[in-house]
């Protein structure tokens, strides 16, 4: 009988540790590839962080995946119009944990109108300083980019995402 082997019905007893499994993507190794995530994306591996607390296990998983944790707590947001309401909620959360938010004009206006502090920066094709100066100057820890449809806008989004990966953002 299974019971004779020491197994009991029900859930496994709670462990005294946390385990966090994290996917690993090889974006930086695939030059000139668009790194936007979609449902068809597959990771090239995974790593595991194990510790006595969830925060420490998550930290170890980030380190194992090669993800650098923020140095400056600066972020760029540039989102399409239909994503602005959701961007406001995300902006509020990041502002609450101490992030300084740089955003393109339309996104900055949406954030500011909702009470989120945002510093407007120029788009790629506009004069410097622009958002690429911040990324290439290694002043940014996080980029949230949801580019609108269309060839020119898609090109901008590609450049933003690719530059972020290549500079370790």
Model-assigned labels for residue ranges:
Residues 1-169:
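ATP-dependent carboxylate/acyl-activation modules
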């Amino acid at each position: 009988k299974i019971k004779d082997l020491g197994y009991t019905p029900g859930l496994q007893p709670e462990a005294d540790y946390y385990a966090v499994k994290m996917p690993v993507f090889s974006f930086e190794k695939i030059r000139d590839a668009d790194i936007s995530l979609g449902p068809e994306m597959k990771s090239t591996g995974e790593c595991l962080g194990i510790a006595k607390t969830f925060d420490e296990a998550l930290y170890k998983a980030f380190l194992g995946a090669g993800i650098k944790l923020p140095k400056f707590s600066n972020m760029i947001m540039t989102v399409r119009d239909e994503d602005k309401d959701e961007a406001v909620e995300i902006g509020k959360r990041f502002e609450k944990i101490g992030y300084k938010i740089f955003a393109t004009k339309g996104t900055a206006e949406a954030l500011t109108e909702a009470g989120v502090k945002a510093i407007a920066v120029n788009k790629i094709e506009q004069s410097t300083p622009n958002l690429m100066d911040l990324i290439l100057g290694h002043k940014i820890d996080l980029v949230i980019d949801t580019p609108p449809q269309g060839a020119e806008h898609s090109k901008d989004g590609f450049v933003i995402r690719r530059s972020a990966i290549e500079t370790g953002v």
